[in-house]
């Protein structure tokens, strides 16, 4: 199964960032000032005046393997993240990720491993529940889950933190899976059409 990314919420725009910056002088938005928004955003980005870019929000729903979830968890400033938990519920969908750049033979081996591990997870949960209780059984049976298990989580960035995320994760040095996620996120933000000049200002 592939990792999936959906943009489920957007607050703000290029105008929001510009108006935040103009709060320090005059928030009255004339036609002349509106025409200066692209240049203003470029100046702010180039000179490190980035607090106005914290006034917007980008909210994504992501389904990805554990490694990419951990990569996202490492971004804490201006980022909020919640994830489904195998401690609180049984993961019944049996979702797992197969690397697309592996050979067909290797993909089959991993798929078989995931299927077997998930079967053991469900079986262990059933065996452990009578003696340990449902709560402890759920949180301990998950040790059978493979690292390829996919979790669904929602993550929200402000634009400043999103730019930081892009610079680190949408990079050749990043792991392929998180880089693919970052690229898809950027594509979705571009398609929403609210941040054209902000993204240009940061070279994205």
PLM region spans:
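Family-specific signature for flavin-dependent thymidylate synthase
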Residues: 1-204
């Amino acid at each position: 199964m592939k990792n999936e990314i959906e943009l489920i919420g957007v607050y703000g725009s290029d105008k929001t960032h510009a108006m935040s910056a103009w709060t320090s002088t005059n928030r009255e938005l004339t036609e002349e000032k509106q025409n200066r928004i692209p240049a203003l955003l470029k100046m702010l980005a180039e000179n490190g005046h980035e607090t106005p870019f914290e006034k917007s929000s980008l909210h994504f729903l992501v389904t990805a393997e554990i490694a990419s979830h951990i990569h996202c968890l490492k971004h804490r400033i201006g980022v909020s993240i919640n994830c489904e938990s195998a401690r609180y519920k049984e993961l019944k969908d049996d979702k797992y990720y197969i690397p697309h750049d592996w050979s067909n033979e290797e993909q089959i081996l991993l798929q078989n491993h995931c299927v077997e591990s998930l079967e053991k997870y469900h079986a262990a949960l059933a065996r452990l529940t009578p003696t340990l209780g449902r709560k402890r059984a759920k949180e301990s049976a998950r040790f059978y889950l493979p690292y390829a298990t996919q979790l669904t989580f929602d993550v929200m960035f402000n634009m400043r933190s999103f730019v930081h995320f892009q610079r680190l994760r949408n990079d050749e040095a990043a792991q392929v899976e998180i880089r693919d996620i970052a690229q898809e996120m950027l594509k979705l933000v571009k398609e929403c059409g609210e941040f054209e000049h902000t993204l240009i200002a940061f070279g994205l």
